[in-house]
Amino acid sequence: MPGLMDMHVHFGQEYKSKAERPIKIERETEAILATAHADITLKSGFTTVRQVGDSGFVSISLRDAIADGSVDGPRIFTSGKSIATTGGHADPTNGKSIDDYDHPTPEQGVINGPYEAYTAVRQRYKDGADGIKLTVTGGVLSVAKSGDNPQFTLEEAKAVVSAAKDYGMWVAVHAHGPQGMKRAVIAGVDSVEHLSLIHISEPTRQSP
């Protein structure tokens, strides 16, 4: 049997009940969890995975450590840190007092407008990511107010895709709500994850 592939993993996270799950884990803990989960994944028969979103450089460092034989794990293709809009699903400051943090920048994964979208993609390229992860709608495992509303404009999504293609990077999007999915497909992303509330009655894009 050939090695299996998993196209959506988050090695640095451990899913427990909502009551037990911390809102944020420390980077050191994330690195330990990611290394352990990579080893378990390889032993389970998966030889290639796509890591779609973490808190920073953990998956990039893990990918390189596996590649040079320092630790055991599958081959990893990673987006590094996700890209969100202010208050969106992957905004790391959601649920915190404005007195406790500075507004996150595109380099830190939060954008507003096409110009900042280009900045965020170029930073991911500089960081060593293989692709881009956008959170184009709300989600379940965050403290964003909505789980399905669109959180990127079409122009922002198109800017991300355009910049990513310039650097040979794929674009995967987290999407639960139909409007965000539609914008992502029109923008030309490579994959749409989750699709929880997809509407199949209205075609978004037809193959030639």
PLM features: residue spans?
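Active-site mouth loops of central-metabolism enzymes
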Residues: 20-32, 101-119, 170
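Short, acidic/polar
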Residues: 30-38, 113-123, 176-180
